[in-house]
Every structure is written in structure tokens, then in C-alpha cells.
């Protein structure tokens, strides 16, 4: 197409990719927290969906009912990962202008 500078678009795409990758590195240092069972299980994840810590209140531990604790841990982990995903999507949308870039955003 006459008048279209493809090199310009490629440079812009590369800059956008660099900004997104830089922001992802920053997100790795950020934390989100989720709780389950009235706060008896707390999970902290970073901004790139890695679990950083799991804390379990003593009251949540019942040797006769391990399935309840398993359910609380599962719920808290899933909530932390969902919160982390949403946080990452919001932050990357700020950079990409809301455009979904496969494999990046």
C-alpha cells in the first residue's frame, strides 16, 4: 500500500512488546491476597500467577476432617490466581490500550 510505512508499525509493535515485558517483570514483584474460610486460609500470589505463600490458621486444622482444609486451600488458591489474572489484565490493558495481543496480554 502506498504511503504505509510497515517499518514504523513494526517498530511500534516492538516498543509495545518491550513495555509489556517490562511491566510483567514489575508484576512479578507485586502481590495480591485471597482468603477462604473466614480468613483461616490466606494465599498470596504475585502479579504473574505464582503462589508466594500460604498461611493456615491453627483453627482450620482438624485431623479428623482434612477434606475441609483441602477445600479451603483450593478455594483460596483459586481466588488468589483469579485476582492476580485480573490485576495483570488491567495493568497490561493500560499499556496496550485494551487491545488483546495473543501470547502477551
Swiss-Prot record:
Record's subcellular location: Cytoplasm, Nucleoid
InterPro entries reported for this sequence: YbaB-like_sf, YbaB/EbfC
UniProtKB keywords: Cytoplasm, DNA-binding
Keyword GTP-binding found: no
Gene3D superfamilies: Nucleoid-associated protein YbaB-like domain
This protein's record includes keyword Coiled coil: no
Domain of life: Bacteria
GO cellular component, one term: bacterial nucleoid
MF term (GO), any: DNA binding
Role, per record: Binds to DNA and alters its conformation. May be involved in regulation of gene expression, nucleoid organization and DNA protection.
Subunit composition and interactions: Homodimer.
Similarity comment: Belongs to the YbaB/EbfC family.
Name this protein carries in UniProt: Nucleoid-associated protein MXAN_1931
Amino acid at each position: 500500500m502506498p504511503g504505509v510505512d510497515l517499518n514504523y508499525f513494526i517498530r511500534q509493535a516492538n516498543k509495545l512488546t518491550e513495555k509489556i515485558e517490562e511491566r510483567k517483570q514489575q508484576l512479578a514483584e507485586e502481590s495480591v491476597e485471597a482468603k477462604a474460610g473466614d480468613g483461616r486460609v490466606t494465599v498470596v500470589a504475585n502479579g504473574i500467577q505464582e503462589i508466594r505463600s500460604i498461611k493456615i490458621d491453627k483453627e482450620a486444622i482438624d485431623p479428623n476432617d482434612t477434606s475441609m482444609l483441602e477445600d479451603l486451600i483450593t478455594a483460596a488458591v483459586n481466588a488468589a490466581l483469579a485476582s492476580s489474572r485480573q490485576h495483570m489484565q488491567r495493568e497490561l490493558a493500560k499499556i496496550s490500550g485494551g487491545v488483546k495481543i495473543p501470547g502477551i496480554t
